Amino acid sequence: MSEIADKVKKIVVEHLGVEESKVTPEASFIDDLGADSLDTVELVMAFEEAFSVEIPEDAAEKIATVKDAIDYIEKQKAA
Amino acid sequence: MFRLDGKIALVTGASGGIGAAIARTLHGQGATVILSGTRQAVLDSVAAQIAPDGARAHVCPADLSDPAAADALVAAAEAAAGAPLDILVNNAGLTRDGLAIRMKDEDWNRVMEVDLAAPFRLCRAALKGMLRRRAGRIVSIASIVGITGNAGQANYSAAKAGMIGMSKSLAQEAGARGVTVNVVAPGFVQTAMTDVLAEAQREKLLAGIPLGRMGQPDDIAAAVAYLVSNEAGWITGTTLNVNGGMAMP
């Protein structure tokens, strides 16, 4: 697993207070990890801060799963 | 009841009559207060009156007409207190009165900027931490004219009505995290802002107040102290009218 993936996972565990084993790439923040809409906004803000990236609103809306977040951040970092 | 021991409270416009009373009251209830405003010397003297020994009182000047200053103030207040913010009191405000047909854009814009945009920016900055910590209290000081309107105050009454609507929205957004957002709408309070009224105007206003007197800054401060207390934890999105009965919306 990449460094980015590890860090994303850690943020999700910390923020949503879920068990690490549940934070699989396919896990949906809302459907599987019990996040509400405010949690997803806070997660995006936490990612922005942790990775020094800006995630615009239309991109943030598409980040539904752990993998979505990792992919988006990896793409930004590679660019 | 209503103790605020250990709480960190930022009060904007703390150099004014109502703001100073709010800061003094919250400090008296045990809170650490951060006094903000544009006039450093006045803030220093208010802080010295509130806490002669300097304990639990800090001064963080800011000019809220500068968008960056509003964003930076929450961080500066937390740095001064050495702890995250529990309470935000949006009290700073100004008036640029005039009949609408003669009101200049700059008078409209300045009131919107300082009385509505700056409180929004402060709420936004404070909410980030409050939501994360799952606790917090925001009280914004609006005005009776935000509900009733007032000839000569199209800008001020629009900004204060806006503050009420904004607070209801924020209350809905923040409720799931235990953060409450409320408004206190003062009526006719004796301050520098109302001292400029002519005697005839004053008498006419007094005739419309069932409780028969002008408000004192402490009347407003007591309402704020209640809304920021733990005991008011099931009140959010409301506007508490503190006006001697002048309007009963």
Curated annotation (Swiss-Prot), chain A:
Keyword terms: Cytoplasm, Fatty acid biosynthesis, Fatty acid metabolism, Lipid biosynthesis, Lipid metabolism, Phosphopantetheine, Phosphoprotein
O-(pantetheine 4'-phosphoryl)serine sites (modified residues): 37
Record-linked Pfam families: PP-binding
Database matches in InterPro entries: ACP, ACP-like_sf, PP-bd_ACP, Ppantetheine_attach_site
KW Lipid metabolism (keyword) present: yes
Posttranslational mods: 4'-phosphopantetheine is transferred from CoA to a specific serine of apo-ACP by AcpS. This modification is essential for activity because fatty acids are bound in thioester linkage to the sulfhydryl of the prosthetic group.
One Gene Ontology cellular component: membrane
Signal peptide (residue range): none
Pathway: Lipid metabolism; fatty acid biosynthesis
Gene Ontology molecular function: acyl binding; acyl carrier activity
GO biological process, one term: lipid A biosynthetic process
Subcellular location(s) of the protein: Cytoplasm
Residue intervals of the Carrier domain: 2-77
Family named by the database record: Belongs to the acyl carrier protein (ACP) family.
Function: Carrier of the growing fatty acid chain in fatty acid biosynthesis.
HAMAP family in UniProt: Acyl_carrier
NCBIfam families according to UniProt: acyl_carrier (TIGR00517), PRK00982.1-2 (NF002148), PRK00982.1-3 (NF002149), PRK00982.1-4 (NF002150), PRK00982.1-5 (NF002151)
Name by which UniProt lists this protein: Acyl carrier protein
Originating species: Gluconacetobacter diazotrophicus (strain ATCC 49037 / DSM 5601 / CCUG 37298 / CIP 103539 / LMG 7603 / PAl5)
Lineage: Bacteria, Pseudomonadati, Pseudomonadota, Alphaproteobacteria, Acetobacterales
